[in-house]
């Protein structure tokens, strides 16, 4: 296992997640969620139309223009970097220039393998504009791992600063991804990242494997929302990397769980909380105790996510009244009511 010391997640709820609302995120939705992601400690945030720059004009209109997405989000943030996706033949060079002029920090150039040569002018301009420039090879598994690495080398020679393995079909097993990573690292001298989809339930596992094999970034979305079966889950990946690997300590994972429950579950119209199930899994606490723990948290006005985690730290088999009281006493001074009230007050996805 070799971990990149500069590893960060790249949060793409506001771009890939835009698919699930038919590109309906407004610029207000985008800037508000970006604001609370930054507040949670996320440093890299991708925004905009699911198909990237220019797609509103050429494919299907989004709820906001590319310019408004960038301008409104940039004006809201103080430290986090924002980026957008761009597919040559959908996006134009002028689209990238306009976005850069408005303060875009990074650009992710998406191409199918057979269109690699289209990258040259886009990479050249993006680098000239001082954008952090990534190449995302969509449908990476359409060629074998050796051929993939050869095309990645071409993108590096054009000036790309990072190569993304993109499991567009969500079909890769961990052993497949490991081979792509191995062959890629023998060919290029720049970092790599991974963007997974969850069609066969491998997005989280593959993202962790990429992390363990020196990826600079893996892409995540809150609750895994995204095109098709979705992506790796921000709250799950952050919590696992914090608890099992001691990484991403600057991110407030508990706050992200609340974002997932209070905002994204509402957006999805979920009747049963997926976030709570994730929290129980992360804490190794059986969901047979869920009702009991929820009721205890309400009666004692304690954060349910913190309570579940504290219970898991004490006992992953039993959950009687004594265990819950002991867990409660261990966290009762960890007050986060102000930040959660702030989250409740921030209106988006609902006007």
PLM regions and their residue ranges:
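Catalytic cores and adjacent flexible loops of soluble metabolic enzymes
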Residues: 1-351
């Amino acid at each position: 296992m070799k971990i990149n010391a500069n590893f960060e997640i790249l949060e793409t709820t506001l771009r890939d997640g835009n698919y699930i609302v038919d590109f309906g995120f407004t610029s207000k939705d985008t800037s508000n969620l970006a604001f609370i992601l930054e507040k949670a400690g996320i440093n890299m945030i991708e925004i905009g139309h699911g198909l990237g720059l220019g797609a509103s004009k050429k494919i299907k209109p989004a709820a906001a223009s590319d310019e408004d997405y960038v301008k409104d989000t940039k004006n809201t943030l103080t430290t986090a970097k924002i980026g957008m996706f761009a597919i040559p033949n959908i996006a134009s060079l002028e689209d990238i220039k306009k976005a850069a002029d408005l303060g875009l920090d990074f650009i992710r150039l998406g191409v199918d393998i057979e269109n690699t040569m289209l990258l040259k002018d886009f990479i050249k301009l993006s680098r000239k504009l001082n954008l952090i420039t990534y190449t995302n090879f969509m449908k990476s598994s359409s060629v074998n791992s050796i051929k993939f690495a050869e095309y990645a080398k071409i993108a590096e020679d054009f000036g790309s600063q990072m190569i993304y393995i993109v499991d567009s079909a969500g079909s890769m097993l961990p052993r497949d991804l490991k081979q792509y990573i191995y062959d890629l690292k023998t060919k290029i001298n720049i970092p790599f990242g991974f963007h997974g989809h969850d069609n066969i339930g491998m997005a989280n596992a593959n993202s962790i494997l990429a992390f363990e094999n020196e990826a600079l970034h893996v892409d995540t979305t809150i609750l895994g929302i995204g095109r098709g079966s979705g992506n790796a889950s921000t709250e799950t990946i952050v919590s696992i990397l914090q608890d099992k690997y001691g990484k991403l300590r600057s991110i407030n994972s508990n706050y992200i769980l609340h974002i997932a429950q209070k905002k994204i579950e509402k957006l999805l119209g979920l009747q049963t909380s997926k976030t709570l199930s994730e929290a129980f899994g992360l804490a190794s606490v059986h969901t047979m105790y869920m009702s009991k723990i929820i009721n205890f948290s309400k009666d004692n006005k304690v954060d349910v996510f913190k309570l579940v985690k504290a219970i898991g730290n004490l006992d992953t088999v039993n959950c009687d009244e004594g265990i819950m009281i002991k867990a409660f006493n261990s966290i009762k001074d960890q007050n986060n009511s102000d930040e959660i009230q702030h989250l409740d007050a921030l209106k988006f996805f609902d006007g």
